[in-house]
Amino acid sequence: PWGYPLLLFPCVVLFGINYFAFKIVGVICLVGAFIFLYYHPILSKERFRMSVLLVLALLTGNIFYWGYVNSVSSELPFFCFLMFSFWTMNKLYALKEQTEKRTILYIGLGILLFFTAQIRTEGYFLFISLIVLQWKNRLLGWRFFLPYASALCIWFVFTLVFPSGYTEHFEHFKVVTLTNLLHNIQTFYEYPAQILYIPFSLFNLFFWVNCLLGLYISSRKLTAESVYLVSTIMLLICWPYDVIRYWLSLFPLCFIFFIQGFRFMCMVWGKKAGKWVLYPIIGILICSVWKVSIKYATSPIQIYTTINPNVEGESAQEMYAFLRTN
């Protein structure tokens, strides 16, 4: 996809191949994602406000997210534009009626969703979220189709201007086996404890049970987010690769539903009793995340490894020169 290269294009024009400038783009995108999450039109309501604040406390101090600032990859830009897309969809469709003043915004929404999908192709699930959101609000009329029409026009321009990839994504499904599916399910099940640095595997069961409960009770309000999350997880289960970075933009949604489900379970015991259970446990999770992140940030780090090579080193520059020549 051409979305991320286009984001880096201004940096290349201004600074050349400067990896520090590329990483600044990652920092801006990560901060931008947090801002869009905080000001989300639905999540900013009283019912979700505490959940969002707790999620941001888990994310802003989590070295898992800040660690991606040190790499030039599409995860953080996609995370930012995904949150921007959710913010825009909920902002436009918070009211059921369509107005002429919003016509240009509906066109812009289609362009935004398409560009997000051009950063990472799982972003195309946003169009499914949009369809469900429009259907839920019973939106009719020609403006209903504007986001799709504008996205289709931009897609046509992209196909004319930019070359396509060497293969199709559907080619990857040819190597999927039942073993892959079972392995992915097991691996994904274990991710929450890894992301939150919890040494107890039983926490994963606790997390996913509450996440599913929160998804069930919050899906009517967070329709677009619920549809996108379920669709993408189903794709990743069937995907032949189990890379944790694919989940970087999904975990904030999982955390929100987890806290919503956990709050509901706690409130079943009574409002006061629930708070005495909810906040200490979430507080322990936040302290665990921040403790590990501070320890990691203050420890000597081996900067260059086989996974994170020195892309500005002499051998790397020789390889780039060879590729440019040939």
Label for each model-derived stretch:
Residues 34-41, 130-135, 191-222, 226, ...:
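Hydrophobic, aromatic-rich transmembrane alpha-helices
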Residues 117, 142-211, 236, 251, ...:
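Membrane-lumen/periplasm interface segments of specific transmembrane helices
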Residues 49-54, 102-107, 127, 145-153, ...:
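Signature aromatic-anchored transmembrane alpha helix within multi-pass, membrane-resident enzymes
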Residues 21-29, 57-84, 89, 115-126, ...:
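Multi-pass, polyprenyl lipid-linked donor-dependent membrane glycosyltransferases
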Residues 24-46, 80, 84, 88, ...:
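Transmembrane-helix motifs of polytopic, lipid-linked glycan transferases
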Residues 2-9, 14-32, 68, 72, ...:
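Loop-to-helix entry region of an early transmembrane alpha helix in multi-pass inner-membrane enzymes
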Residues 34-61, 79-80, 100, 222-227:
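Transmembrane-helix signature of polytopic, membrane-embedded enzymes
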Residues 55-57, 83, 103-120, 127-132, ...:
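Membrane-interface alpha helices of multi-pass inner-membrane proteins
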